[in-house]
């Protein structure tokens, strides 16, 4: 993989222990809040628009489904260009610009009376594509030993935000109407910009100057990694099924459970919460026991099982509830593990690009799922769930050959005195098993990102000699 040298500043020393430091906690809180607010803004619309969308001029089932999923097309188009920029320039200004575009799209939707204007507004809102940039910034400000925890926390934040959005959307729409709900999305974007100020700002200097890397080369470096492509397919299938599902569910909840749109939020919340509670220990097992591949594939199989159950029994109350509960277990687990896996497997210098492609796949899935859901609205429900199950099974078959991700650890050392840091860092990086070095001259410390399985007794001794200290590795 590509090795890099980063230079960062932080407010306090970080020791080699199991706890996060203040900067890492602030980063997770701030970036998690940004993600949560943005996901709330995007997804509160999803469980209500299939019903409330009929009040717009020129609305048809297909156009309603398109309005639900079209934000995904904007995301898919702009995630990758914004990620390229974020691998070359500071990440924070790019995030601010994206959130302002998101707010503009929400305002257009709030002022719309025609379904085509809503579609345009949702497309513009989706064009504020900052998901991958936020994830890459999080990777910048967290150490490798806490990266999985941070990424899993972010994934769970996304899952919880979607869960809360599906519960809040019907309730708020009942109070504020659909245009009021769109204004809530505008407010969430503005507040998210404010949260960015509590996130530490890293100063990244890469060994391989990315300005000398063409966009085509960056793209090719990431796309040639088969396992990352399998993760792109997984997130595509996940969000295709989820967006199509929530285009279909409002009508099925009305037909099977006799619930109004406002009441449906009280069903979504406990079901999603149950899936979340069961998913958490699965995620812990994936990392602590190094069973990420097994948990990942089991979660995909669980997703399929939920859809199969819905295809067979969604016309009954028990069948509908059980099928959704099983689906949400798989959904929450996958939502949390995929970002972590991408951060572990992607080349260091192209991490934002890899996350951008993954985010594009995610939102392209949402776009296709929304359009597919609009088409399936006019079909028998058992057929709709069967189609979604078949699509997910096909994805699972392609994903099965995926290999377990690399498991790297971080070590904190004191910088030797009187060294040329550039030359010294290049010597460190030349050692097989050293993947990355992050130096903080103000604190006189550095983090080494290591693959301990590649280190030999000789390279350990050489590393100890270069650092001037005995290393417990």
Give a label for each model feature.
Residues 88-98, 287-300:
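Cytoplasmic membrane-interface "Motif A"-like loop-to-helix N-cap segments
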Residues 18-24, 201-232:
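Juxtamembrane intracellular "pre-TM" segments in multi-pass secondary transporters
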Residues 154-197, 381-382:
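Helix-loop-helix hairpin linking two adjacent transmembrane segments in secondary transporters
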Residues 121-158:
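Cytoplasmic helix-loop-helix junction between adjacent transmembrane helices
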Residues 47-62, 247-263:
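Short amphipathic helix-loop junctions that connect adjacent transmembrane helices
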Residues 77-113:
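Conserved MFS/SLC helix-loop-helix module at the cytosolic interface between two early adjacent transmembrane helices
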Residues 79-90, 278-291:
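Helix-to-loop junctions at the C-terminal end of transmembrane segments
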Residues 187-205, 395-403:
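C-terminal membrane-cytosol helix-exit motif in multi-pass small-molecule transporters
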């Amino acid at each position: 993989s590509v090795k890099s040298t980063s230079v960062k500043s932080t407010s306090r020393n970080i020791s080699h222990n199991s706890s996060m430091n203040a900067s890492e906690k602030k980063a997770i809180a701030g970036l998690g809040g940004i993600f949560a607010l943005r996901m709330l803004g995007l997804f509160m619309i999803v469980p209500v628009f299939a019903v409330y969308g009929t009040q717009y001029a020129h609305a048809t089932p297909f156009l309603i489904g398109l309005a639900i999923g079209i934000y995904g097309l904007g995301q898919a188009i702009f995630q990758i260009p914004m990620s390229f920029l974020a691998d070359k320039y500071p990440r924070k200004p790019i995030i601010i610009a994206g959130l302002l575009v998101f707010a503009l799209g929400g305002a257009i939707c709030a002022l719309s009376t025609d379904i085509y204007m809503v579609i345009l507004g949702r497309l513009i809102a989706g064009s504020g594509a900052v998901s991958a940039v936020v994830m890459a910034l999080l990777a910048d400000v967290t150490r490798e030993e806490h990266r999985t925890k941070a990424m899993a926390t972010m994934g769970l934040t996304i899952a919880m935000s979607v869960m809360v959005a599906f519960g809040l959307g019907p309730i708020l729409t009942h109070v504020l109407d659909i245009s009021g709900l769109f204004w809530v999305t505008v407010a969430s974007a503005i507040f998210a910009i404010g949260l960015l100020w509590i996130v530490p700002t890293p100063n990244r200097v890469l060994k391989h100057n990315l300005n000398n890397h063409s966009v085509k080369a960056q793209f090719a470096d990431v796309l040639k990694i088969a396992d990352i492509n399998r993760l792109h397919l997984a997130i595509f299938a996940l969000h295709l099924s989820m967006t199509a599902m929530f285009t279909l569910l409002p009508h099925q909840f009305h037909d099977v459970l006799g619930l109004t749109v406002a009441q449906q939020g009280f069903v979504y919340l406990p079901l999603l919460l149950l899936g979340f509670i069961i998913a958490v220990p699965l995620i812990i097992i994936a990392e602590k026991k190094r069973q990420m591949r097994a948990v990942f594939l089991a979660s995909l199989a669980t997703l399929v099982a939920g859809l199969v159950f819905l295809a067979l029994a969604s016309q009954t109350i028990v069948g509908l509830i059980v099928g959704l509960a099983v689906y949400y277990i798989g959904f929450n687990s996958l939502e949390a593990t995929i970002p972590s896996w991408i951060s572990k497997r992607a080349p260091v210098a192209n991490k934002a690009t890899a996350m951008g492609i993954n985010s594009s796949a995610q939102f392209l899935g949402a776009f296709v799922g929304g359009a597919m859901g609009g088409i399936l609205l006019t079909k028998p429900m058992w057929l709709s769930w069967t189609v979604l199950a078949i699509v997910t099974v096909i994805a699972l078959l392609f994903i099965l050959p995926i290999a377990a991700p690399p498991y790297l650890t971080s070590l904190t050392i004191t910088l030797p005195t009187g060294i040329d840091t550039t030359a010294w860092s290049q010597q460190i990086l030349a050692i097989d098993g050293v993947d990355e070095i992050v130096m903080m001259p103000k604190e006189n410390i550095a983090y080494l990102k290591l693959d301990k399985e590649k280190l030999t007794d000789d390279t350990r001794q050489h590393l100890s000699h270069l650092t001037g200290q005995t290393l417990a590795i």
